A protein has these predicted regions:
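Amphipathic hydrophobic-ligand
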Residues: 52-54, 87-95, 114-122
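Low-acidity, Ser/Thr- and Arg-rich intrinsically disordered low-complexity segments
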Residues: 2-4, 9
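Glycine-rich portal/gate segments that line the openings of hydrophobic small-molecule binding cavities
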Residues: 61-109
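Hydrophobic/aromatic beta-strand elements that line small-molecule binding cavities or substrate pockets
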Residues: 27-29, 58-62, 93-100, 110, ...
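Hydrophobic ligand-binding cavity/cleft-lining segments
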Residues: 13-73, 77
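Beta-strand/loop substructures that line and gate deep hydrophobic ligand-binding cavities in soluble
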Residues: 109-157
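A conserved amphipathic terminal alpha-helix motif
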Residues: 95-97, 102, 144, 148-181
């Protein structure tokens, strides 16, 4: 992988800890872009539409009427394991609440009612000499961990993969708008 393509690659693998029926995940990304450009892109509905294209999207709605807050409601089709199909069916509903707390912190609350799961994530931004460092700390809580491993599988297939994909899409999107500016 060239340095150009690795601009937003994780610096270490995600850390999984199972504690009190919650999974704690930590990841770090580097970006060639400034914190200001990253935050502006993450507030932009067009970016979120672009990131939604990569998922099996059925429906998406936005609400950005509150200052420094973006609510996104989505429905996606997800590959549901046979063991969980009695409890869960498609489409899966995802409700995201992005709160832009400051120039160095975004809080994201993601609820997935179909599988009684919620994700609380914090994105911390730091300026570096050649861009930015983004630390993502997430806590995944589910009421159905005991009934099925589906919630863990969902997190493994959706949340971890979505973070990596979203940062790649963010990098590409910023490059494309930079060219058109």
């Amino acid at each position: 992988m060239s340095a150009k393509n690795a601009a937003m690659s994780p610096t270490y693998p995600m850390v999984w800890q199972n504690k009190d029926m919650a999974l704690n995940l930590k990841d770090t990304f580097h970006s060639e872009y400034s914190v200001i450009k990253l935050l502006a892109a993450l507030k932009d509905i067009e970016f979120h539409k672009k990131r939604a294209e990569s998922k099996s999207l059925k429906k998406i709605e936005f609400n950005d009427t509150k200052a420094n807050t973006l609510d996104i409601s989505r429905q996606i089709d997800f590959e549901i394991p046979a063991a969980a199909q009695k409890m869960v069916s498609n489409p899966i509903s995802l409700n995201e609440n992005w709160i832009f707390r400051s120039q160095d912190l975004i809080e994201i609350q993601l609820s997935i009612p179909n599988i009684q799961t919620s994700i609380s994530a914090q994105m911390y931004f730091e300026t570096e000499n050649l861009g930015s460092l983004i630390r993502v700390e997430s806590i995944v809580q589910s009421k159905i961990f005991l009934m099925s491993s589906f919630a863990e599988e969902f997190v493994s297939k959706y949340w971890k993969k979505a973070l990596l994909e979203d940062f790649e899409i963010l990098n590409q999107w910023l490059k494309s708008i930079q060219i058109s500016d």
